[in-house]
Amino acid sequence: VKSTNLMAFVATKMLERQEDLDTCTEMQVEKMKTSTKARLRTESSFAPRTWEDAIKDGELLFNGTILQAESPTMTPASVEMKGKKFPIDFAPSNIAPIGQNPIYLSPCIPNFDGNVWEATMYHHRGATLTKTMNCNCFQRTIWCHPNSSRMRLSYAFVLYCRNTKKICGYLIARQVAGIETGIRKCFRCIKSGFVMATDEISLTILQSIKSGAQLDPYWGNETPDIDKTEAYMLSLRETGP
């Protein structure tokens, strides 16, 4: 039911941006909307609700109304792959938070070398997770913007650090087998807490990220507390982890 509501919300919001979609993409979104309505009718026997109700519930699951955001004003990011650095393009996008799971709200743990954008990339069945090495903060948001170079859409769930007020990572589903498939991959990755990888090393890193969020003494904070986080990290430097 929740997945259907989320898909209803995503399809509706994407169709509101038809001017950004090419013909092929628009047809795929319409197909996704049709299949979601069919699922809604199937579920009506045990979870009766209207299409409008599904959209509203999907919006609540995303925890807020989608906002039109400008390009973030921050240091340009880059990702190193095979010895080469590639810039990360933070284009104007629609941003909306997804949920308030406390495990994903741990304070950020910054590096002390000042390198905010040291990043690594993980791949899993068509989805790519880019995670900066200096942050253990998971404020989940959706970031959906058109990729003008290929005239297609990329779907990215952004991890936003609530302490440094900067983007700390994101999960992208490439348009391989259709829009609906790509978005579902993103949902599955987020629900699993990112404990997935294609090799043992990446799996170990991702597991440590998730366990670190649970073990950090400040992970339950409802509001950012940069002073406490910095003091905690300084104590670790002085006494050792």
UniProtKB/Swiss-Prot annotation:
Highest taxon of source: Viruses
Compartments, record wording: Host cytoplasm; Host nucleus
Sorted UniProt keywords: Host cytoplasm, Host nucleus
GO CC terms of this entry: host cell cytoplasm; host cell nucleus
Transmembrane regions: none
Task of the protein: Suppresses the RNA silencing-based antiviral response in Drosophila cells.
Name listed for the protein in its UniProt record: Non-structural protein 1
Organism, as annotated: Influenza C virus (strain C/Great lakes/1167/1954)
